Amino acid sequence: MQAPPRKPDVSGGPFRITSIETQKHDKSRVNIYLDGVFAFGLPRDVVIQQHLSEGDEISEDLIADVLLLDELSRAKEKALAYLSYRSRSIQEIDVKLKKKGFSDRTIQQVVDDFIRVGLLDDRAFASAYVQTRMIQKPMSKRLLKKELYLKGIPETMAGKVIDEIYEDRTELDVAVSLAERRFSGKVNIKEQKIRKKISDFLARRGFSWEIISEVLMNINSK
């Protein structure tokens, strides 16, 4: 786990802001000097928002507030970067930010803000996840529910989303289609060895023995 940035020792005060300098490697952040000594870095937006200027006095309470705003800003940047690869569930964002060392309070604020603006939506995430799965790696409803559960999606929500994506297809339809696509062109698909491979393959995709046996009977009747 990555340790959170060390909090500066700014107990006591009030302090005088003696310098605000743009950071060399990140123009969106500035270094704050109190009484001639470097104290901490902040996003430029926070400095503007809090009307901080050189020569101002700053209290211990205000320092605590701006450091919380800084943590929130950094947490949102991490979350946005994580979301840039693909959509995420609320639980995935929570776990990722915890690993980065952010506080529960900050993580909850990020989640609340992202939900409010539509960047986090567990139902939309679940729907996109299931659609992608059914295109790239079709599987049983049970296995889909398990995968969504591991990503923090409630069982009821997962069930509704999966039923919507499955539409008029049954699990048997999906299993038969999978078996035919995977094992088409085999010399003798009725051969015991091939039938065992079909059974194992469908079991790995989460299908029940009842479904698998129906698939095998379907193949046997052809």
Locations of regions flagged by a protein language model:
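An alpha-helical, amphipathic repeat domain used for nucleic-acid recognition
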Residues: 1-222
